UniProtKB/Swiss-Prot annotation:
It catalyses: Release of signal peptides from bacterial membrane prolipoproteins. Hydrolyzes -Xaa-Yaa-Zaa-|-(S,diacylglyceryl)Cys-, in which Xaa is hydrophobic (preferably Leu), and Yaa (Ala or Ser) and Zaa (Gly or Ala) have small, neutral side chains. HAMAP family: LspA (MF_00161). This is Lipoprotein signal peptidase. Keywords: Aspartyl protease, Cell membrane, Hydrolase, Membrane, Protease, Transmembrane, Transmembrane helix. One of its GO terms (biological process) is proteolysis. Its EC number is 3.4.23.36.
């Protein structure tokens, strides 16, 4: 249950921040938080990461539902045994559902976190994207730890 609370909190944070952006900013508006480095920029994305597969909503609906089902399955089957895995899956679940809500109700995803590194503008993202990425990183760490345990037990 704890892991579903983490996912729920991430969904709420994601949807609240997106609602604030849509309500208070025009598309394309940008406000510096740390001038020259971090901006809040109102942006929309009808595709996936970095704007790939623009407008392919049916594809994202199917893939996201399959991913959500897989995450819930693994969370139920393995998440309770391993805290790091549970947190990783919860963050991934929250991120997947957060962006899925946008795709279903807006047919696009609201993005706003905009980082600039010199002349390079990192693709604009949101809380759900961050939740997914942190979850995937934690999942990789868990996999490395599991691999190390397996290697130690066989030697």
């Amino acid at each position: 249950m704890f892991y579903y609370i983490i996912a729920f909190v991430m969904i709420c944070l994601d949807q609240l921040t997106k609602w604030l952006i849509v309500k208070n900013m025009m598309l394309g508006d940008s406000y510096p938080v740390i001038d020259g480095f971090f901006y809040i920029t109102s942006h929309r994305n009808s595709g996936a990461a970095w704007g790939i597969l623009q407008g392919q909503m049916w594809f994202f609906y199917v893939i996201t539902l399959v991913v959500i089902a897989g995450i819930v399955y693994y969370l139920q089957k393995h998440g309770q045994k391993d805290k790091l895995l549970g947190v990783a899956l919860a963050l991934m679940l929250g991120g997947a559902i957060g962006n899925f809500i946008d795709r279903v109700f807006r047919q696009e995803v609201v993005d706003f976190a905009h980082f600039v590194f010199g002349n390079y503008h990192y693709p604009i993202f949101n809380i759900a994207d961050s939740s997914l990425c942190v979850g995937v990183i934690l999942l990789f760490i868990q996999m490395l730890l599991d691999g190390k345990k397996t290697k130690e037990s066989t030697t």
